[in-house]
Amino acid sequence: MVVFTGSTVEEAIQKGLKELDIPRMKAHIKVISREKKGFLGLFGKKPAQVDIEAISETTVVKANQQVVKGVPKKINDLNEPVKTVSEETVDLGHVVDAIKKIEEEGQGISDEVKAEILKHERHASTILEETGHIEILNELQIEEAMREEAGADDLETEQDQAESQELEDLGLKVETNFDIEQVATEVMAYVQTIIDDMDVEATLSNDYNRRSINLQIDTNEPGRIIGYHGKVLKALQLLAQNYLYNRYSRTFYVTINVNDYVEHRAEVLQTYAQKLATRVLEEGRSHKTDPMSNSERKIIHRIISRMDGVTSYSEGDEPNRYVVVDTE
């Protein structure tokens, strides 16, 4: 263990990186203790202490593929969940209902998209989201909630009963009665525990609307929670979503924002998409983005769809999926 000190945690880290002659992304950093100002800035004053250890290139690559260093193991071990056949069947059932409703409203779904869904080439809900039809799926889920509140026991179909039984067979805890305020409080406490384990001081708040829960994190160390290219934040959101999924049979949607990161990131992506489209038109060839989360890819697709002469599509597998922008 190599311990470095400084008047602040950041100063101690910089001293250690300089002495070890390694970049931050190749260092495993552990905060031993934070600085103490002492009484009147004189008595009991203590410097910050950090333990810095160089890590191998293999470890760096693995961490970069999942999430950045310094995060609890349960985040680093997290990847996009692989669904079982039963889970895919439940997911597909919701999407088929959504497609029927889309076509009833006079909106078309291309045969190519339908083929991708039926062949399981990509997650069905992801396809709908990227083609701009995820709202229909959300509306169907809200309608289910309204039926429950209006006395769903008499309206529940055999298909609904089979779905509930299938979820129970998967080992998922089925909650039929829930309080959205309580659910929001539970998931907020869960995320708070993870952030505490990261030794980051932060304040959490939440707001909600029916089945959508928004968590707001305010902190003086946003970079540690957001991570490189937002990877830590993405992992936190996946953990929170998985936490809700494992506790409730019906879907809740949770989004997490750190300070104003989500808004700022959206603005950056909009500008980036416009510049990328201009470059494609000027050079007459396709260009691809860095790996992005599903929500970020959706922003790129939306901006490109509003521009003439260019089109976009997603390629690759999670978590390294990216957007390709090409000429029409």
UniProtKB/Swiss-Prot annotation:
Has an N-terminal Jag-N, a linker with a phosphorylated Thr, and 2 RNA-binding domains (KH and R3H). A phosphomimetic mutation and mutations that prevent nucleic acid binding are not tolerated in strain R6. The KH domain of this protein interacts with KhpA. The Jag-N domain is responsible for targeting to the midcell. Its main location: cytoplasm. One of its GO terms (cellular component) is cytoplasm. It is found in: Cytoplasm. Phosphorylated on Thr-89 by StkP; there is another phosphorylated Thr residue in the protein, which is more strongly phosphorylated in strain R6 than in Rx1. Dephosphorylated by PhpP. Phosphorylation is increased in an R6 strain with a C-terminal MreC deletion. It comes from Streptococcus pneumoniae (strain ATCC BAA-255 / R6). Changing residue 239 to Y: Loss of interaction with KhpA, pbp2b can be deleted, KphA not found at midcell. The gene is khpB. GO terms for molecular function: RNA binding. This is RNA-binding protein KhpB. Interacts with StkP which phosphorylates it. Interacts with KhpA via the KH domain of this protein. Interacts with MreC in the elongasome. Interacts with MltG, RodZ and YidC2, interacts with MltG's N-terminus. NCBIfam families: Jag_EloR. Belongs to the KhpB RNA-binding protein family. Keywords: Cell shape, Cell wall biogenesis/degradation, Chaperone, Cytoplasm, Phosphoprotein, RNA-binding. Residues 54-180 are annotated as: Linker. The modification Phosphothreonine is found at residue 89. Residues 263-328 form the R3H domain. CDD domains: KH-II_Jag (cd02414), R3H_jag (cd02644).
